[in-house]
Amino acid sequence: MQTTFKTFAIFMSPLVLFSCGGGEQKKEETTESKPVVFTQPEFTYPQTWKDSSAVDTYFDLKVADPYRWLENDTATNVKKWVEEQNAVTFGYLDKIPFRQKIKDRLSDIYNYARASAPSKEGDYYFYTKNSGLQNQAVLYYKKGLKGQEKVFIDPNALNKEGTSTFGIVGVSKDHKYAAIGRNDAGSDWQLITVREIESNKETGDTLWWCKFTDAAWYNDGFFYSRYPTPAKGKEFSAKNEFHKVYYHKMGTPQSKDILIYEDTKNKLHYHNIGLTEDDKYLVLTKSSGTDGFETHYKPVDLKKGGFTCLFSGFTNKSSIVDHKDGKFYVYTDIDAPNYQLVAIDPTKPQKENWTKIIPESTHLLDGVNTAGGKFFASYLQDVSTHVYVYDYSGKQESEVKMPGIGTAGGFAGNPEDTETFYSFASFNYPTTIFRYDIKTGKSEVFFKPETKFNPDDFEVKQVWYTSKDGNKNPMFVVSKKGIKLDGKNPTLLYAYGGFNANITPSFSVNQIPLLENGGIYCVATLRGGGEYGEKWHQAGMLLNKQNVFDDFIAAAEYLIDKKYTSKEYLAISGRSNGGLLVGACMTQRPDLYKVCFPGVGVMDMMKFQKFTVGFGWVPEYGSSDNKDQYKFLYGYSPVHNVKDVEYPATMVTTADHDDRVVPAHSYKFIATLQEKQKGKAPCLIRIDVNAGHGAGKPTAKVIEEVADMWSFMFFNMNKDVMYK
């Protein structure tokens, strides 16, 4: 496929990314956090009006929705409610005595240079760098690896607040132009402009209301996908419908773009367009959500329609990796839950004519990239990356040796390339960029960051535990070396468990304040993810979703049973689908945790499909519109399962511009929780203003949010921090 890439935003999500990193640097003096008894600040929850008349009917089930009015996030009364909730939350946080110390430490350890792997486009190399505390990474380029480094786009200069991100979404085949995608305030909406690479000047081409698209260049323009212009005031909440594919010719207004594909019968389908590297075929992928997708193709032209279906239905996932010598090379899970690579002649696409290039293995084939006329196949073996090199006949030539257990990514390039680049990271291994010589099979360090703590102080273990139904699950445990298993360690348990997503070892400085203060950071591998293939995914989706919650609860019970921690010192966290995970587990087992952090979570399982792109999650969750699924969803929907009982200290996090998981989910959940909390622990919501779902959040905001979360956790565990 045509090589396209996006800048790697150095975004350290407060709960998603993981621990540790290296360098012989100044070390903060700490010991284990001291047990103390803090006095809870006095606070009063804002009054939240209940509309007793708001009731929805799902078949034979009537469901009260008293906080429905909070769904209108642009309404004056909702904005006032947001201000009142934030006033209570930040008033509480302001009274935590060590909050500033944690923020200062985070600012110190964030201040290190980091970079992405370079992407080669003709003679140019593009990459991002962040000098340390820059709000957004800067996109650089140079002509040749030893050429002069120049700034291509500096988001920090274009937006002083640091809330805009920029990335290359496609480079023209003559390497003269780059299409740039801009996202503001964390929104999924993308504004596409074009820059001439040599002069680094904008051409004036401007494309609005793009979402989930790259730019596939062809001749003097490119193919892309967009939505119709949304109604004013509904840009961040209205359901997105009729995703269409267009061709934009350089120098013409968007209104003159040529419609290439639309589906008037299926208004909720996504449509993405690509181009094979040899420019012979347009490849259209259609999806109804996050399950699988159809693949269609046609010889390249600018006519509407005319596509031939290669893979039909949305039950499988297949993507064309390359087209060479008249064959499509396809990465697919058809008849291979752990995926395989096959060669398909488009004139004889029937399955009996396929040629297996890389057969299915007992381990998950996590992806296949091409560079220098080779396939780079990435496998997951017990949630750790292993990469093997194959020729186009399927002969395995070598393995790319990794520094240890961790996660590798990259290995993209063009057929004529003699080198490729990749990144490697782990919990205690800072993200390092390697250059790989395709001819010799040798790797060398290209960029290694220097961080302000010693990774040798920490250790990583992978343990296995048993879930409720007997399923065996792995979990990573990160801590200082020699930590005592006495049940008194402040512990944060994180997981995701959904959408076939792989949660693999990664690197972040966010967890350092926990580890430096004698804490433990744990990442549980749950069903619903993709770490062990499609069967593992299916075991945690739709009517099997309870398995995910059971896996997470079992992980917590394991940590308590093995005395890593206890109920008094255990916090749980997750974001997005992981926010749903935390919401469900804290309503099912409120007795098991001391602190809960549901972040940007899907909390109303009866209505999620009615907002923005929520309809795309129906294949994963099911729908309240389905008579076979609505009662199951209602049975675990966090908003609908808050009882009049004692709940742990909870800080919900969301953002007012989140157009992926709209903030109404979190608003309604916290309103219900504040209403029904029978204990004394605080139930607060931290609402980020002028921010979105998380991607591209400015470094300054990340530091503030992470500091607030650690402060809230340590304070409610009665643990002091040992920073001077």
Which positions does each model-derived feature cover?
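Active-site-proximal cap/loop segments of hydrolase catalytic domains
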Residues: 523-724
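Cap/lid segment of the alpha/beta-hydrolase catalytic domain
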Residues: 156-172, 181-187, 201-203, 436-442, ...
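Non-catalytic accessory segments flanking enzyme active sites
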Residues: 76-170, 181, 269-323, 367, ...
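A flexible loop/linker signature enriched in serine peptidases of the S9 family
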Residues: 130-137, 159-163, 182-191, 206-211, ...
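Beta-propeller blade signature
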Residues: 141-142, 193-197, 239-251, 296-300, ...
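Hydrophobic beta-strand positions that form the internal "hydrophobic ladder"
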Residues: 125, 178, 222-223, 282, ...
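C-terminal motif of bacterial Sec signal peptides marking the signal peptidase cleavage site
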Residues: 16-19
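Bacterial signal peptide processing site
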Residues: 21-24
